[in-house]
Amino acid sequence: MTPGIIVGKPYDLPFEEHFKGGRLDNSMWFIEEKGSEESTFSLMQGFSADGDGGCAGYVSASAKDAALLGSGKISLKGAANSTLVFSTKSTLADANGKVVVYIRKPDLSEKQLCVVDYSKLDNSAKDWRTTTVTYLLNILLCLT
């Protein structure tokens, strides 16, 4: 999932990233491109789900392209009900892309938490979708 091993102190909870104004709130983010060089993540201004004027956006040059956006380590120490909330949007009414959320555990194993599959959603309104992923005592809930 990551292009190497991330070292250093993890972020503590609560952890938030809003990309406010098209800028980073937290310094440790990485991108791994898995397609053509024309496809990329970028920080965008004036486009946001929460009204703060920014987001991280992915623009694909090909339907086969993919990329990974990852954060630094986040400590879940002491968290009983870990929750991840994120918003996605496709500007295509007939979108077929996927947003797949993974975590990497301290033992380096990976766990898929959630998939937002636009090919299975009605995207005719092209609105923002907010997804909440909650991990409760080994029960995983994904609500879109």
Where are these regions (language model features)?
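Extracellular carbohydrate recognition and processing domains
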Residues: 109-141
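Extended, low-complexity, turn-rich repeat/linker tracts enriched in Gly/Pro/Ser/Thr and Asp/Glu
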Residues: 76-80, 89-97
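Short, conserved beta-strand segments of beta-strand-rich sandwich/propeller modules, principally
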Residues: 83, 142-144
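Short beta-strands within extracellular/lumenal beta-sheet-rich domains
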Residues: 56-79, 83, 129-132
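N-terminal pre-domain segments of enzymes
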Residues: 1-12
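Solvent-exposed strand-loop boundary residues in beta-sheet-rich modules
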Residues: 35, 105-109
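Beta-strand signatures of extracellular beta-sandwich domains
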Residues: 100-102
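Extracellular glycan-recognition surfaces and repeat-rich motifs
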Residues: 10-63
